[in-house]
């Protein structure tokens, strides 16, 4: 009998599906974080494969800051309706009442209150003991050293010195009362593999990933797409149409576009093959001098 050899992408797919099923078998109340980006779309696709023909055995959670791109909100609602999964949307109402926003309070405070604290609120509100996320090790240095099962204490804090060994594909999911884990099924994927998989599996993604002429403001070296009227232009600033796309998506004032002509998936893949920069170069929160990604994770960030 001829032995079938899996391609590299098929091996990654099998590993991710194994992780998804393992967590559902081990944990009482899991949830999948849904940030609406390309990695979330791939993770959702893998989850639907993992539990086909049944429905997803967990809800999806979107932590809404109120500052996502309008196209992201449209895509989120359309996807939830098309696939019929349970979608939970949580917003930090206290932060919203305080008027917290990235322009007035800066990226660090905005992220801490509207994302980190909001996520912790949702974890406590629904009593989730495991949360899937689409982070990958190739994205950023603190994520590179994080385990697939990332253990958090009862305050949702991550201690990089207190991690469990993961030998081969064996994961220790034992937790104490009040503790939880963050699970990263895409840990071993790279950005180019994500795009190749999206192309091969014909996965729907937010149109912002494709190049198009968009209203752009250049500020502090970032190409900011003006998505609504909540921005005040500084002296000498102008908005002009530029051909851009996004490699990563987040709050629109904190997410920089890249100049590009890639309007199809093959074009994006070609562009990625010659790119020498990280996709997260366009995320303002990663450049906060006093609040690195590791510090955010120690405070409870995903």
From Swiss-Prot:
The keyword ATP-binding applies. It holds the Pfam family PAPS_reduct. Pathway: Sulfur metabolism; hydrogen sulfide biosynthesis; sulfite from sulfate: step 1/3. It catalyses: sulfate + ATP + H(+) = adenosine 5'-phosphosulfate + diphosphate. One of its GO terms (biological process) is sulfate assimilation. Keywords: ATP-binding, Nucleotide-binding, Nucleotidyltransferase, Transferase. One of its GO terms (molecular function) is ATP binding. InterPro entries: PAPS_reduct_dom, Rossmann-like_a/b/a_fold, SO4_adenylTrfase_ssu, Sulfate_adenylyltrnsfr_sub2. Disulfide bonds: none annotated. Its EC number is 2.7.7.4. Belongs to the PAPS reductase family. CysD subfamily. Heterodimer composed of CysD, the smaller subunit, and CysN. With CysN forms the ATP sulfurylase (ATPS) that catalyzes the adenylation of sulfate producing adenosine 5'-phosphosulfate (APS) and diphosphate, the first enzymatic step in sulfur assimilation pathway. APS synthesis involves the formation of a high-energy phosphoric-sulfuric acid anhydride bond driven by GTP hydrolysis by CysN coupled to ATP hydrolysis by CysD. This is Sulfate adenylyltransferase subunit 2.
